[in-house]
Amino acid sequence: MSDTSVIPGSLAVRNLFEDLLGREVTVSPGTPIEQSDVPTAVLALFTNTANQLYAILGMQLELAANAGAALGLLPAGAAEDSIDEKKLTPVLAENVFELCNVLTSLLNVEGAPHIKLYQVVYPGMPIPNDAVPYLMALGRRLDLTVEVARYGKGKFSLALAH
């Protein structure tokens, strides 16, 4: 069986963010999310049909808060408050969950096993032991800086587990 795992391109990520948020989004090559960012980052774990970890997404708190606020049509100040407090409000967390769920579409390709969102880990929650090593590893990954117009920017790191 051939490998059908793919990392989406930056254009696909930008288009998805723009379509979902209804505003201009700029993406550019970025550096990987750092270990020091992990405790306050939003992590999304994606699994295949066998419930095996397929990919992990790390969004720096700044990106998660700004995208969550834009999705909910909240003022930029709502995102800034969450960033200052190093946690997401329940409304922002719900919006970020929806964003992560929609991002699953970038991982599903024809002829490959179905990929689903398994879990979203918010700042302050316990992080599954196997998640961070995959997020930090070199290999098949996409590291971007994503900027949401009139809100702000942050790191977006997506790494395949295989």
Which residues make up each language-model segment?
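N-terminal auxiliary interaction/assembly segments of multi-subunit proteins
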Residues: 1-162
